[in-house]
Amino acid sequence: MTLTKNSASRMRTWQEEADMLLSLLDCFVPEREAVFASSEFFTGKRFYDLCLENEARTPEELEKKLGPEYKISVLAKNKEQGRSFARKLRELGHKIVLTPVVFNVSALNDGRNWSGSEYMVFWDLIIANKCHAIYLNEFWQFSDSCVFHYIAGLRTGKKLLDHAGNSVVLDSARKMVTSAIRRLEDYGFDVFNLHDALTVLKTFSSVG
């Protein structure tokens, strides 16, 4: 069978691609039977530590300092850390564990990648429809995506747990994110995404 490639007629919108991927997941992931393994990828403790070591304060500055090593030192190591976290959860008995760090749309779509916000909305849909719990890897409060995964779980009533399986209640989450923001800003980082996330967290009423 010959596969047709680079056909303009096959270009899909983000919504069409998201619906297609959700439909694929329906084949083997029943509703709300998965756990979501949230782990840092683009931003997080590893990224900020490397920035401090290399006198950088943005991804662009760090990539300029490290060159090709940037993808290995940050993205590749974070991907492996995320995979390891998911494996740990499976070893604890969770049959279906979904981790976002290995997902890459551009590899499947002729190099046309999604935007960061499109990835985030897609994972929000996955969390809402496929997961009953979210596990947050260690130092999650320093990662933009992890904090927004927490918010997605909060909105949809999921169990919210840290890497050791302890419940992460709203008041604790607010304090952790606030502390992370203060620490990073003390070092000169502009963490507007974490500020946005904290603003959202403050709109929820504390329960438990």
Where are these regions (language model features)?
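Conserved catalytic or regulatory cores that recognize and/or transform ribose-phosphate-containing ligands
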Residues: 1-208
